[in-house]
Regions:
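N-terminal carbohydrate-binding accessory modules
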Residues: 35-84
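Aromatic-lined ligand-binding clefts that engage carbohydrates, nucleic acids, or primary amines
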Residues: 425-440, 469, 545-568, 575-576, ...
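Aromatic-lined substrate-binding rim segments of carbohydrate-active enzymes
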Residues: 73-79, 87-136, 214
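N-terminal secretory signal peptides and thylakoid transit peptides that target proteins
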Residues: 2-18
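Active-site neighborhood of glycoside hydrolase catalytic domains
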Residues: 164-232
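Catalytic-core region of carbohydrate-active enzymes that cleave or remodel glycosidic bonds
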Residues: 246-336, 342
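Disordered, acidic Ser/Thr/Pro-rich linker "stalks" and the adjacent N-terminal cap
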Residues: 394, 398-399, 568, 632-667, ...
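Short beta-strand-plus-loop segments that form exposed binding edges in beta-rich domains
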Residues: 471-476, 600-605, 673-680
Length: 794
């Protein structure tokens, strides 16, 4: 273990011509064995380092998403962009996957990451959770919390959550307390919780979390972050507040100034956005970002780019957007430093935009060179092992399936087997399936279940004799945002079979045998019996390639279906040929000289069992025709004779607005009808819709789905309707504007949400598309409907 590195007074900080505080004071320097302690404080107008103003120019990088061997390279790039601080999440589940067993070794060595940042002249902002979000499995919360009953205890003062969270934070203090600036390290500030305003309103919960961080031994300033429209909701005097946004810094800073005196800071400025499987690759405007960054710096504000460098969600750590949209393995984020650490035009634009705000005499170092890449000639995977023939012998027997967590299974592949008696054709149905399932009768595939569409039914043919029913379930990711983080996996009972009859009666399907391949924390492969040739059904495949040296490459998985890749026993991550990502980043340090073994799990079967290594990634190729088969939709809007629950106009601008109905309305479905937009154009857009109950609180969205949408943009950008109910203000539903789909996409536009059950709706909360004044799609006149069946068909 290395010792802490020293600091020197590199520059004196004075006010520049722009009026911005300069950010070059007291930067870390490598080379000495003694580190000086510093005082960091939050002043009336500035952050103060040893009593002098410090303007924080920060960028986010998650060490868990970057090979340890490349941490220095990425930190050098962050420094070269003009930043003086790196922001780092800790993911609780990454360090405590099994309760009470902490791991800070190797890739998880957060203290070493801090030391390396200090050596590169960077300060550190630490975000230890306990909740993180970050498109990470369960938002960083450990799965074993879900062994406790209930769907409303996470991120609350319930002892079932608070007690293990306190223990986690004590462990963080033990591991990283010496990395604070007060003890000669680089950590300036520590965040408490994360965007709690998106989730709850219990201010005493925030106070409890603050106390837990203090009790863990942190003595640097503590802060909380929230989106602009939630800053006031959860602000408490004991915690400094920063605002998160991807546009309109003036509004964000205004919200901060309304609740506290002190420096202005954007805690997350979105340089791009994350990708989800099956949706277009997302990008962020460099020009708009540079304008906003300069506006913040010119206003004496500080910022943190989310992300400066996104990297890759290696292994099985990817999260899932609500209601259920799994995130891609690539976490490129369209950040200024690309997935493989590359810098280019976007990086150069950010660097040029920040340069005028450097301290006098502060010099930007050159960006590090790209790591070299190599191509790999196509190689065949000639051996396979059927999943159902390679399940472990350990069998769990249960009358009705329960969530995996109840069986102490974390994630992976799970087989559920039982016997169905002879009988007529009918419908097999589970209460819930998390996440995807393939149904077999006597070994023959008969259908799939898919939580993305809440499709938990499969039609079964008549049976002349008893048959073996087997359901193979695959867990993809736990939801990382909203109340849906209570995301218990597996086949949830009761499971029923309803025969086709004049008066059908559902029959319980019971007495299940359950066997699982638990991939655990690091996606460890089970023992597998490979044979030459192609196995039937879901299978593991094995092959390999020779390498003279280890250089970065991008594995082309476009010929495969859906599953996981391992290289030399290391779990590289998930792939899915529906896109938009078609390649998998393989870092050079993970490639051996000589023979390299590759194992691929493919659940739907490869079209060609070959892989090649490419010199560049493919991040933006959609293949919807390769998705799981689903019944064709016959959904039709049916508003004839339905009286609107409300008709009126939204206010202009980007602020969130509450609309209360004259009288509550009851039904299962809600329709927002856009009649026109403020800009007079044919488009409609919504960042977020929530519904209000009589008490003014938002209704639970856990079982919401989109029942119907008249138009959505799906080619130029991800303007899908699900964006309107995913809890994120930074993306949005947008009606079609590109190609043939746009020609008939005119007002009125309708979006129908199925609430998952009967509900009383007393109003709605509408968040317009965010951005500069004049962005397209902000709705002016509208109608709101509530009814039992506003959409007919399936």
């Amino acid at each position: 273990m290395t010792t802490n590195l020293p600091r020197r007074r590199l520059l004196k900080t004075t006010a520049g011509a722009t009026g911005a505080a300069l950010g070059g004071a007291l930067l870390p320097l490598s080379g000495s064995t003694h580190a000086a302690a510093h005082r960091f404080a939050i002043g009336d107008k500035d952050f103060l380092l040893d009593g002098k103003p410090l303007q924080i120019r920060c960028g986010e990088m998650h060490f868990a998403r970057v090979p340890r061997e490349y941490w220095p390279h990425r930190l050098k790039a962050i420094k070269a962009m003009g930043l003086n601080t790196v922001c780092a999440y800790l993911f609780w589940n990454y360090h405590e996957w099994r309760e009470g067993k902490f791991d800070w070794s190797g890739q998880r060595d957060a203290a070493e990451f801090c030391r390396l940042a200090q050596a590169e002249g960077l300060w550190v902002i630490l975000r230890p959770g306990p909740y993180a979000c970050a498109e990470w499995e369960m938002g960083g919360l450990p799965w074993w919390l879900l062994k406790q009953p209930g769907d409303a205890f996470l991120r609350t003062r319930s002892p079932a959550f608070i007690d293990p969270a306190r223990r986690w934070l004590r462990e963080v203090g033990r591991a990283l307390g010496q990395q604070q600036v007060t003890r000669g390290g680089p950590i300036l500030m520590v965040q408490v919780e994360n965007e709690y305003g998106f989730f709850g309103s219990d201010l005493d919960y925030l106070r409890t979390m603050r106390r837990a961080v203090l009790d863990a031994g942190f003595d640097v300033p503590l802060f909380q972050c929230n989106p602009t429209n939630a800053v006031a909701k959860t602000h408490i005097p004991e915690l400094f507040s920063v605002a998160n946004f991807g546009s309109d810094p003036q509004a964000g800073f205004k919200a901060l100034a309304a609740v506290q005196q002190g420096p202005l800071m954007c805690g997350e400025y979105y340089s791009g956005w994350f990708d989800t499987w099956g949706a277009p690759h997302r990008r962020g405007s460099a020009d708009g970002a540079v304008r906003d960054i300069q506006a913040m710096l010119g206003a004496n504000g500080s910022f943190s780019l989310y992300m400066a460098h996104g990297g890759t969600t290696f292994g099985l750590w990817g999260g899932c957007d609500r209601p259920f949209r799994p995130d891609t393995t690539s976490y490129d984020y369209d950040a200024p430093i690309g997935e493989a650490g590359w810098t280019g035009a976007k990086f150069d634009a950010y660097r040029a935009g920040i340069r005028p705000f450097l301290a006098p005499g502060e010099v930007l170092p050159a960006a590090p060179a790209r790591n070299p890449v190599m191509t790999i000639a196509p190689f065949a995977l000639t051996e396979s092992a059927a999943v159902l023939a390679n399940l472990p012998a350990r069998t769990i027997r249960d009358a009705s399936p329960r969530p995996l967590e109840a069986y102490d299974i974390s994630r992976g592949l799970v087989s559920y087997r039982t016997t169905l008696p002879a009988g007529p054709a009918g419908t097999l149905e589970a209460a819930r399936v998390r996440d995807l399932a393939w149904v077999f009768v006597d070994g023959r595939p008969v259908g799939t279940m898919d939580t993305r569409q809440r499709r938990y039914k499969v039609e079964l043919a008549a049976r002349a004799a008893p048959v073996t029913l087997e359901i193979l379930l695959y867990t993809i990711a736990r939801v990382n945002f909203g109340r849906e983080v209570h995301d218990r996996k597996g086949l949830h009972g009761p499971v029923t079979f309803t025969p086709k009859a004049a008066q059908p009666v559902a029959q319980a399907v019971e007495q299940w045998e359950i066997r699982a391949i638990d991939f655990d924390a690091d996606g460890v492969l089970p023992p597998l019996a490979f044979k030459r040739g192609r196995a039937a059904g879901p299978a593991f495949w094995r092959g390999g390639f020779e390498a003279g040296r280890g250089l970065d490459t991008f594995l082309d998985m476009s010929g495969w279906g859906q599953g996981i890749v391992w290289i030399n026993g290391r779990c590289l991550g998930r792939y899915w040929s529906i896109g938009p990502t078609q390649t998998m980043y393989l870092p050079g340090p993970w490639i051996r000289r000589g023979r390299n073994e590759v194992v691929v799990l493919d659940l739907t079967g490869p079209r060609e069992a070959r892989i090649a290594g490419l010199a560049e990634p493919v991040l933006d190729r959609l293949r919807p025709e390769l998705d799981l088969a689903r019944p064709p939709s016959s959904a039709r809007l049916q508003l004839d004779g339905v009286k609107p629950a409300f008709e009126g106009e939204f206010a202009p601008g980007a602020a969130t607005q509450d609309v209360r109905f004259a009288a509550p309305a009851r039904g299962r479905q809600f329709c927002l009808e856009s009649l026109d937009a403020f800009d007079g154009k044919q488009y409609a857009a919504v960042a977020e819709i929530a519904l209000l109950g009589r008490d003014g609180k938002t209704l639970d969205q856990s079982d919401w789905t989109i029942a119907y949408v008249s138009s959505e943009e799906a080619s130029k950008e991800d303007g899908g309707a699900l964006n309107a109910i995913n809890g994120q203000n930074s993306d949005y539903w947008h009606t079609a504007y590109a190609g043939a789909a746009a020609r008939n996409a005119v007002h009125p536009h309708r979006l129908v949400i199925d609430l998952g059950g009967d509900a009383e709706v007393a109003g709605l909360r509408y968040t317009p598309r965010q951005g500069e004044e004049g962005v397209t799609g902000r709705i002016r006149r509208f109608r709101a409907y509530v009814g039992e069946r506003l959409v007919v068909g399936n």
